């Protein structure tokens, strides 16, 4: 097991033991000490900014991510021009793979987590829940992603990602008509919204096929940030990038920016 997984297991055990702190106090203290040591060890790895063996094995250069985007654009061009009722599920899936890769390529905006899960496509005058994420279409002005539910929402509040990228806007508009469910991403077979776990599996499928590697959202974020930091960003630019990616500059430098 990796250290983060072990730490999470121990936290879960402590929560159970805390139902009777009098009886299990010594055990709780013992596990808390183990958690502290594991966290120190995790932080040491972060401080070294070294790629783990798993990251090294699955790492791809950021230019390869962009090259794949160009390839997928070319491969799906004829499909996007086909009448919608003539598209097979396999062809729809190829279009959605292109969209998902676009969303996680960092080309249109800095890479976020699995926040597109179960995301509804809505109009700006629709009533929105404050615990769900949306793709908002506007009568005037650019559409945007409204993120109310994400890992650091508690600290950062609602986030809006305005879609300035014309190509992505056109792709989403076309895809919304093709899938016709009212959701941004779907399970093609069941026509149901894609879950966070579904996004992880979908990304794995895409990158296994094209790179023969297992690339998660977290690894994509590392690849993206490492490439950005190679451009010698100013402290202000690093802070802005961290805000866009919904974490702190410190986390970006310690956790995501990787050196060989």
Question: What would you call each of these model-derived segments?
Answer:
Residues 67-114:
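Basic, Lys/Arg- and aromatic-enriched nucleic-acid-binding interface segment
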Residues 118-163:
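Conserved tyrosine-mediated DNA breakage-rejoining catalytic core shared by Y-recombinases
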Residues 25-85:
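Flexible interdomain linker/hinge and immediately adjacent N-terminus
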Residues 6, 199, 252-253:
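Helix-turn-helix DNA-binding helix
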Residues 213-214, 233-257:
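Short, polar N-cap/turn motifs at the start of nucleic acid-interacting alpha helices
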Residues 160-220, 224, 229:
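Active-site/catalytic core of tyrosine-dependent DNA strand-transfer enzymes
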Residues 1-35, 218-223, 246:
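Non-catalytic DNA-binding core/recognition domains of DNA-processing enzymes
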Residues 100, 117, 217-233, 241-242:
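Short, basic/aromatic-rich helical patch in the C-terminal catalytic core of site-specific tyrosine
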């Amino acid at each position: 097991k990796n250290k983060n997984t072990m730490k999470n297991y121990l936290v879960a055990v402590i929560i159970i033991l805390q139902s009777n702190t009098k009886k299990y106090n010594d055990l709780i203290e013992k596990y808390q000490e183990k958690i502290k040591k594991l966290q120190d060890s995790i932080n040491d790895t972060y401080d070294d900014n070294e790629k783990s063996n798993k990251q090294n094995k699955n790492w791809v250069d950021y230019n390869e991510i962009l090259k794949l985007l160009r390839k997928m654009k070319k491969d799906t061009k004829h499909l996007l021009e086909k009448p919608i009722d003539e598209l097979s599920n396999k062809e729809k899936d190829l279009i959605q793979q292109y969209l998902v890769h676009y969303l996680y390529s960092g080309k249109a905006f800095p890479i976020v987590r699995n926040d597109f899960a179960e995301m509804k496509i809505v109009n700006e005058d629709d009533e929105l829940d404050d615990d769900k994420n949306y793709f908002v279409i506007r009568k005037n002005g650019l559409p945007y992603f409204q993120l109310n539910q994400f890992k650091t929402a508690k600290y950062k509040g609602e986030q809006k990602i305005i879609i300035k990228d014309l190509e992505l806007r056109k792709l989403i508009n076309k895809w919304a008509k093709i899938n016709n469910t009212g959701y941004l991403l779907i399970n093609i077979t069941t026509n149901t919204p894609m879950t966070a776990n579904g996004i992880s599996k979908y990304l794995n499928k895409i990158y296994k096929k094209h790179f023969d590697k297992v690339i998660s959202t977290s690894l994509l974020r590392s690849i993206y940030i490492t490439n950005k930091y190679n451009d010698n960003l100013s402290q202000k630019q690093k802070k802005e990038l961290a805000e866009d990616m919904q974490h702190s500059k410190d986390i970006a430098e310690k956790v995501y920016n990787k050196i060989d």
